[in-house]
């Protein structure tokens, strides 16, 4: 029995060592080999044999040879025990076998390592056993049937063991990269042979090898993904930065374009200022003519609501026409946040002036409508009369002066009604009432008119008998214009700028004599707005007190003026806040002497104007427009001369008979009532030749080719005569 147990233990030990090494082998060959080895051991241990031993035995051995075979196996097992101990797969199993042998009493300890085998030796032995033609049972019986192994066989066994482990690792790696279960599913024989109980250390190492590769692969993949994301993020940031830069450049281009466009627009507006003023005055005259053509009954049938609506419509039309001049003010103001306060005041002043201008034009239109009717209806009662100087009495203490003021105040209150006024309780007067009140408005007898003013109470009572004022509830304290004489068809001056002593009644009523520009009415409008702000209308004021307030306002506005004749816009002691057509004509005549005037020169020669930034800018723009027309004509005629075949500048000359001179004189001296100085002809000739030389030399291809010509012409200005410093210079020049 002990021999039988030892044989079985040796068989199990051999099988386990083969499995731990991991050698692949076929089931049939291995089974046959183990069956033969088992039969051999059983026959050696049991001489008598048995039926079971006979079944597994293939070759019968002699009784004398059985102990030799067993001795050889034990000897070889003892010699290989030390050689197999370094292998990791044999450590645990060898210790288990030693423990098992110790438990059995230490008998036959040499069997613990007798099951050593390897892939190369077993396969080689199986091939030799199957292919050999020899009948020797020693060679086919078992792997231990050979004589003692040499050192070369031991080294070869170690190399084969290492190659087997390397092949196993490569197989595991290939399985992990493709399909981890392919090898196990495809090799069922190996799975059947491999035991279920594998050592814990081997299992841990296999798991570690299987886990290392996917973790490294996953980390590399994550690094690749993160690098890709970082690259995309960087590209996105660069694109965003480029987009922001392009947006900044676009905004800069837009700002430059708007600046150029605004400057061009402002120049075009300045070129058309004079024509706009002329068209505006013609429009007002046309409206006045249409209104004059209406019948008296139609005017009498207007109720207060319709009258106010019509007046407000006129105001809106005038404000629409003034939009462009209003826009020029804010362009100069929006230069910086630090200069908001003073330029904001300037903007408010300009806006107030423009609104007052529109208001004054509406008042003029309404006054002309109502003042033209008496001249048509009563020509035989009111013949053409001379305007005496007595009507310009000291401090305005004149009956007709106050009647005119009363008349103007009535129409002013119609345009801007007092919120306290009511029209529901008092009806408008009829045609008969207006006919009775007309003598109080326009009647004047020069032969009986005293030079001194009547008592205050006498004319106050007569003033407030006006049906349009008293019946409609208009307050006299809302005095609109302290100087309404030009609005009453009695202009201060002639077209030449001198005060006129007499005008026929027909001329007085004509639209031309009533045409007032924006500049001449700005002073009166500003003064009236001052009265409206500081002296609001109050129904509690009695008529006498209201009239006295009006007189005091006139005196306060006049200041130290002792005579009403000094209110003339072109008198030396009165200051204007606006520019008139006479100022424009004066500037055109000054252009014959100076093309580039300074602001100080303008203040010296326009002493009757109260200068501010707007006035100075307007005058400078006038001269800029003059120069532009001048240079355009010079370039035009220079090119025309080149086309005509002129080759030398000596052939170019300007005389008073040439076409270029006539064009310039028609623009700057339209009435041809001023003798152009000879110096201007010389300057014009030099300018023409400069343009001719520049065009011949091909300098006109440069956008700034005219700047060189400008530098030459600006040095040719001459002294302006002293007579231009006088406010009445136009009259004096024409009389000379």
UniProtKB/Swiss-Prot annotation:
Residues 450-460 have a biased composition (Low complexity). GO terms for molecular function: DNA-binding transcription factor activity, RNA polymerase II-specific; RNA polymerase II cis-regulatory region sequence-specific DNA binding. Belongs to the Prospero homeodomain family. It is found in: Nucleus. Its main location: nucleus. InterPro entries: Homeo_prospero_dom, Homeo_prospero_dom_sf, Homeodomain-like_sf, Prospero_homeodomain. Keywords: Biological rhythms, Developmental protein, DNA-binding, Homeobox, Nucleus, Repressor, Transcription, Transcription regulation. Pfam families: HPD. GO terms for biological process: cardiac muscle cell development; dorsal spinal cord development; heart development; hepatocyte differentiation; kidney development; lens development in camera-type eye; lens fiber cell morphogenesis; liver development. The keyword RNA-binding does not apply. Residues 635-734 form the Prospero domain. It comes from Gallus gallus (Chicken). Residues 576-634 form the Prospero-type homeo domain. Residues 319-335, 505-518 have a biased composition (Basic and acidic residues). Gene3D superfamilies: Homeo-prospero domain. A motif (Nuclear localization signal) lies at residues 163-168. Residues 103-135 have a biased composition (Polar residues). Residues 103-146, 180-220, 261-301, 319-344, 445-465, 499-518 are annotated as: Disordered. Residues 576-734 are annotated as: Homeo-Prospero. Transcription factor which may be involved in developmental processes such as cell fate determination, gene transcriptional regulation and progenitor cell regulation in a number of organs. May be essential in the development and function of the eye. May play a role in the regulation of the circadian rhythm by repressing the expression of clock genes. This is Prospero homeobox protein 1. Residues 264-274 have a biased composition (Acidic residues). The Prospero-type homeodomain and the adjacent Prospero domain act as a single structural unit, the Homeo-Prospero domain. GO terms for cellular component: cytoplasm; nucleus. Expressed most actively in the developing lens and midgut and at lower levels in the developing brain, heart, muscle and retina.
